[in-house]
Amino acid sequence: MNLEGIKGQYDAIFSLGDLCLTSLQLKDNNLRTFSGILDWVSSPSLKNVNVLLQNRFADFLNLKNLRIIKYISEWDLLVWDEVYNIGFNHDFKTDKNTLTHLGGYAEVKEKYDRRIQRFLEKLSTSQRILFIRTEASFEEVAELEAILSGMIANDFRILIVNHTDVDHLVEKSWSLQRVCAIELPNHNKWNANNHYWKMILADITLL
């Protein structure tokens, strides 16, 4: 599928990682109306995200699976879910959490439980959903497509954005029915590709 195939109206758009780049671009292009589960976390492995989806988020953010890594700023603690290989950069604030005690855990868990419930409801009720993932292999995405096909009642599309050494937007020919895969320049990917994202998302709207 090419970029033309993902155009149109959607009931919901979700980022599936790997960082917050997708969420920032959705926000900048007025396509973000709520927070998703993977919006503000680090999820470096789509393989682990696939397991998370397949398990329908069972044991996600389970306290016994969390490892406190370090302070990453004056305000934030980095905490890692070692089962799903997901890092929380922005959720555990230093006014309530330390290197030895997550005093704000209950509040964070409640927030993510709400996001999970909304995500699963959208999968059941939406007519059309768009998922966007940065950094993924063909094999991982083929597995993702199969997992989502078993979870979603109606139609969906997946946009994969891999950052490589290309110097312009490149569409890839992946033989997956619901997937559009592209490559964007890796150099300064947080700021230098805004015009590409604007073009990619220009003909996508939320109902």
Q: PLM features: residue spans?
A:
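Extracellular glycan-modifying ectodomains
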Residues: 1-207
